């Protein structure tokens, strides 16, 4: 059976029914008691792979829960689905395309066929092209129109052409190469362009225009603005090729813009935008951290690919995380998932994972077009650790929703200040511990009495200090963020998303919902500027158009 042609209805499997019954058995399950009853629980539910240490012991599971979840994966023929992706089958059924971002991190000598053609020589040709360009820039050989070396590289792109590269560039800032600064321009808001341009010198700035079609509205508008700025600063049309390169499958449009053919890096239909940081879309990453570190990033992702393909499901990090996500979404009613990195350099990981997860699994029909019979992708949210503790962690602890969380933390800091990192690590662990333990009414009352409060005051305050606990979380620990470990971490989440899509029977690699807003946006714009007088499809939109037109002044 081809999953992408005849998706499975997992809700009809015996293992799904067994999990539903098992969920009722766990109605009164308490993690706090489970740790007391089983001194080996942490050892049983934690292990290392690819430079990552996963502790999943603070979950609403027993060993038989894990066994049932693994049985679900086996009955859903997850192994076949994994093999189909890596073999280049057209698992993106709606667009009839293979999904081969994994090919971008495979070593020389491997063979991957697309329509009978081995794509690996082309993958490594482009990687070599990237290596040469990065070397020219870092060695001061790529020069602007006044013969000054490039000092600033600006990536113009949005979505997958922005979120992944920005995450990696920021996460690996300790590896940044001296002499070249990297910036990102994504939003069509003119204020973003203005603030960035104020910090740049046109003589020493190189723009990378990243757009598969070379027609993405936000990217093209920003590229045109950058072009106009360059010319206004004294640049010439004849020398424009020194300041603009492109990553696009539309070579003709890039050349028409003024970019030389040899400076147009290709994109392939078998790599989706949110999975593209491993391709030439990752040029700003390589510009920032150097090509050798970029290759380390690829190597770490490749290690995770191997782990995903070969590790038994019960010791397979992306498979386990995917199964736990289904467990909470479909059997416990969880509708969101928090990503909580306790590392300043990982502050953008939540943004990337929002696109990766929600654009992939935010679907309501299966691969064959029939409605889903289960839940699908959760809302992904969160942010950098300690800041969240003073903001939304309150909801995690005492809110009415069950919200699973992933804590991500390094053992060592690149920038140790006194005992700051020990406190950071302690905060991470204590938050996951507090979510699990909670605080009972008896404990709250005892705490208040110990402070000498009158009994009436104890009874008044105690209900507010009760914390339910039993809130699930995973903790991912790395020794220190490196290119290799970061590659493994990002690939881990990519594969987790795919695992869940298989169990839900959906296509994780299209995004038709995104297209509707783009289509309607053209009509709204035409009405805003007065080139279309026909009213909008609804009174609300038309009213807001009229409000804008009545007040807008340039």
UniProtKB/Swiss-Prot annotation:
Pathway: Carbohydrate biosynthesis; gluconeogenesis; Carbohydrate degradation; glycolysis; D-glyceraldehyde 3-phosphate and glycerone phosphate from D-glucose: step 2/4. It comes from Pseudomonas paraeruginosa (strain DSM 24068 / PA7) (Pseudomonas aeruginosa (strain PA7)). This is Glucose-6-phosphate isomerase. The active site is at 359 (proton donor), 390, 518. Belongs to the GPI family. It comes from the Bacteria. Its EC number is 5.3.1.9. Pfam families: PGI. It is found in: Cytoplasm. It catalyses: alpha-D-glucose 6-phosphate = beta-D-fructose 6-phosphate. Its main location: cytoplasm. GO terms for cellular component: cytosol. Gene3D superfamilies: 1.10.1390.10, Glucose-6-phosphate isomerase like protein, domain 1. Catalyzes the reversible isomerization of glucose-6-phosphate to fructose-6-phosphate. GO terms for molecular function: carbohydrate derivative binding; glucose-6-phosphate isomerase activity; monosaccharide binding. Keywords: Cytoplasm, Gluconeogenesis, Glycolysis, Isomerase. One of its GO terms (biological process) is glucose 6-phosphate metabolic process. InterPro entries: G6P_Isomerase, G6P_Isomerase_C, Phosphoglucose_isomerase_CS, SIS_dom_sf, SIS_PGI_1, SIS_PGI_2.
């Amino acid at each position: 059976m081809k999953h992408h042609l005849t998706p499975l209805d997992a809700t009809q499997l015996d293992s799904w029914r067994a999990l539903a019954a098992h969920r009722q058995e766990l109605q009164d399950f308490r993690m706090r008691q489970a740790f007391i009853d089983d001194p080996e629980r942490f050892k049983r539910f934690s292990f290392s792979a690819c430079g990552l240490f996963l502790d999943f012991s603070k979950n609403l599971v027993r060993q038989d829960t894990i066994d049932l979840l693994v049985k679900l994966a086996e009955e859903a023929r997850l192994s076949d689905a994994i093999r189909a992706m890596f073999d280049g089958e057209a698992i993106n059924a709606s667009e009839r395309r293979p999904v081969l971002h994994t090919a971008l991190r495979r070593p020389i000598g491997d063979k991957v066929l697309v329509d009978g053609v081995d794509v690996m020589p082309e993958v490594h040709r482009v990687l070599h092209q990237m290596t040469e360009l990065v070397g020219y820039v870092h060695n001061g050989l790529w020069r602007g129109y006044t013969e000054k070396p490039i000092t600033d590289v600006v990536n113009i792109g949005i979505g997958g052409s922005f979120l992944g590269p920005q995450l990696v560039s920021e996460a690996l800032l300790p590896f940044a190469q001296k002499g070249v600064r990297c910036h990102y321009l994504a939003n069509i808001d003119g204020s973003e362009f203005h603030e960035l341009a104020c910090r740049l010198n046109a003589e020493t700035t190189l723009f990378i225009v990243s757009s598969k079609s070379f027609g993405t509205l936000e990217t093209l508008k920003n590229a045109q603005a950058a072009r106009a700025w360059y010319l206004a600063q004294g640049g010439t049309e004849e020398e424009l090729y020194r300041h603009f390169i492109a990553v696009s499958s539309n070579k003709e449009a890039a050349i028409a813009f003024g970019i030389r053919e040899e400076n147009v890096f290709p994109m392939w239909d078998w790599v989706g935008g949110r999975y593209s940081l491993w391709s030439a879309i990752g040029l700003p990453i390589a510009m920032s951290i150097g090509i050798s570190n970029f290759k380390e990033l690829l190597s770490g992702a490749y290690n995770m690919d191997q782990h995903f393909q070969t590790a038994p499901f019960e010791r397979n990090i992306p498979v386990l995380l995917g199964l736990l996500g289904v467990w909470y979404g479909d059997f416990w009613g969880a509708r969101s998932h928090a990503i909580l990195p306790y590392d300043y350099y990982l502050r953008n990981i939540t943004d990337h994972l929002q696109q990766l997860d929600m654009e992939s699994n935010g679907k309501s029909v299966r691969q064959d077009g029939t409605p889903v019979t289960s839940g699908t992708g959760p809302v992904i949210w969160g942010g950098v650790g300690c800041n969240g503790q003073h903001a939304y962690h309150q909801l995690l602890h005492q809110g009415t929703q069950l919200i699973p969380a992933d804590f991500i933390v390094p053992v060592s800091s690149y920038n140790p200040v006194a005992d700051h990192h020990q406190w950071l690590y302690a905060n991470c662990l204590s938050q996951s511990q507090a979510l699990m333990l909670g605080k009972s009414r008896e404990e709250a009352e005892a705490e208040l009495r110990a402070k000498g409060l009158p009994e009436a005051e104890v009874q008044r305050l105690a209900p507010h200090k009760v914390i339910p606990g039993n809130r699930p979380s995973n903790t991912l620990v790395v020794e220190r963020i490196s290119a290799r470990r970061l590659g493994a971490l990002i690939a881990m989440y990519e594969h987790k998303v795919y695992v869940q899509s298989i169990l839900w029977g959906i296509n994780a690699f299209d995004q038709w919902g995104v297209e509707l807003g783009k289509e309607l946006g053209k009509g709204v714009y035409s009405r805003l500027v007065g080139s279309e007088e026909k009213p909008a499809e609804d009174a609300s939109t038309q009213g807001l158009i009229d409000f804008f037109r009545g007040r807008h002044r340039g």
